[in-house]
Every structure is written in C-alpha cells, then in structure tokens.
Amino acid sequence: MLEIVLASQNSSKLAEMQELLRDLEIKFIPQTEFSVPDIEETGSTFVENAIIKARHAAKQTGLPALADDSGLTIAALNSAPGVFSSRYAGKNATDAERIQKVLEALEAADDSDRSASFHCVIALMENENDPAPLICHGVWEGEIAREPRGKNGFGYDPIFYVPSHQRTAAELDPQEKNAISHRGQALEQLSTVLTEAFLV
C-alpha cells in the first residue's frame, strides 16, 4: 500500500483531510508520527507555502508528502489575512483572537463589501527533489458575518457566512462543510488524480 506523509501539525486540519481521503487505498501518516518539526512558512503565496511544507516532510521522512496551505482572503482588507491567516493576530493567538482582529479590521475599513473566500492549496511531492509537485486548489466563496456563530469547524469558520446555506461554516455539520468547502474541493481534485495515477 502506498504511504504518504501528511505534513501538518494541525489536528483539526488532519482530521478533515483524513476523513475526505478515507476511500483511497493509501495509508496517510501524520508527520507527528515521525517527529517532523514544523517549518517556517516563508512563501508569499499559498502554493509556495504548501510546497515548502511538503518538501520538508518528504526530506525528513524519505516518503511522498502531502501538504495543505489554506487561508482566508477578504476583499475590503486587500486580500488579508491571506497567507498570514494563522498568524494574523500573532503567532500564538487563539482562533477567537484572530476572529476578533478580522472583525475589528473590517469595522475600521469600508465594510460595505464583506465578500471573502477561503483558499486551500494542496501540494503532493513524491520526494524532496520533485521538480513538478502535484498542485490542487479549492476556493470557497462567502461573506464575513458581523459576529461569530456556530460551534463546528475551526479557524475562521464561525464568521464565514455561506449565502447558499444561510449559515456560517461553523453552523454546518462536518459532512455539509466537506462537500462544499475549499479543502473538500482541493482534496476531491487530489483524489481523482491519485485514483487515475495509481488506480487506488
């Protein structure tokens, strides 16, 4: 069975990825099982950061590695927080602190346009020197709610309003969210490619 390292320390993200990839005949192993340390995300795009993380995990383990870099972009904030989504309120900030900073920044800006999108870029590298990593990209369009709502999900989910469902991402159950989310889209692309490539 093919083994692929999941290059993330984020337990919530890992759980989503493993759930969405469960039907593949591939063994996905969290990098924590190899004691792979985090690497600084120095890229200026989601693609660059995903590749940095995948390359690092592949180098440390000698196995193919899959990395996800995701973030929230908000039109009124010139696409912020973007690649800094997880560090928007400081390196060790909580989800609640990041959400509060976004709401305060929007209040200070012209918040008549509250459109936003979640992006997820997945990079799969066969080895650390893979010159052509597989890249999958999902985008989830929505709006920023005026206050947090819902208990599900993680990150900015409580303020990401999904007009088609008239609820925030945190008010969707996990199955609903995975069917339409940015990560769900990117992993669906990945699943299709892996199935065709490896006949898994």
Swiss-Prot record:
Mg(2+) binds at E40, D69. It catalyses: XTP + H2O = XMP + diphosphate + H(+); dITP + H2O = dIMP + diphosphate + H(+); ITP + H2O = IMP + diphosphate + H(+). The keyword Ligase does not apply. Gene3D superfamilies: 3.90.950.10. Binds 1 Mg(2+) ion per subunit. GO terms for cellular component: cytoplasm; cytosol. Keywords: Hydrolase, Magnesium, Metal-binding, Nucleotide metabolism, Nucleotide-binding. Pfam families: Ham1p_like. GO terms for molecular function: dITP diphosphatase activity; ITP diphosphatase activity; metal ion binding; nucleoside triphosphate diphosphatase activity; nucleotide binding; ribonucleoside triphosphate phosphatase activity; XTP diphosphatase activity. The active site is at D69. Substrate binds at S8, Q9, N10, S11, S12, K13, S70, F154, G155, Y156, D157, K177, H182, R183. The keyword Magnesium applies. Its EC number is 3.6.1.66. Its cofactor is Mg(2+). InterPro entries: dITP/XTP_pyrophosphatase, ITPase-like_fam, RdgB/HAM1. It is an enzyme of class 3 (hydrolase). It comes from the Bacteria. GO terms for biological process: nucleoside triphosphate catabolic process; nucleotide metabolic process; purine nucleoside triphosphate catabolic process. Homodimer. Belongs to the HAM1 NTPase family. Pyrophosphatase that catalyzes the hydrolysis of nucleoside triphosphates to their monophosphate derivatives, with a high preference for the non-canonical purine nucleotides XTP (xanthosine triphosphate), dITP (deoxyinosine triphosphate) and ITP. Seems to function as a house-cleaning enzyme that removes non-canonical purine nucleotides from the nucleotide pool, thus preventing their incorporation into DNA/RNA and avoiding chromosomal lesions. This is dITP/XTP pyrophosphatase.
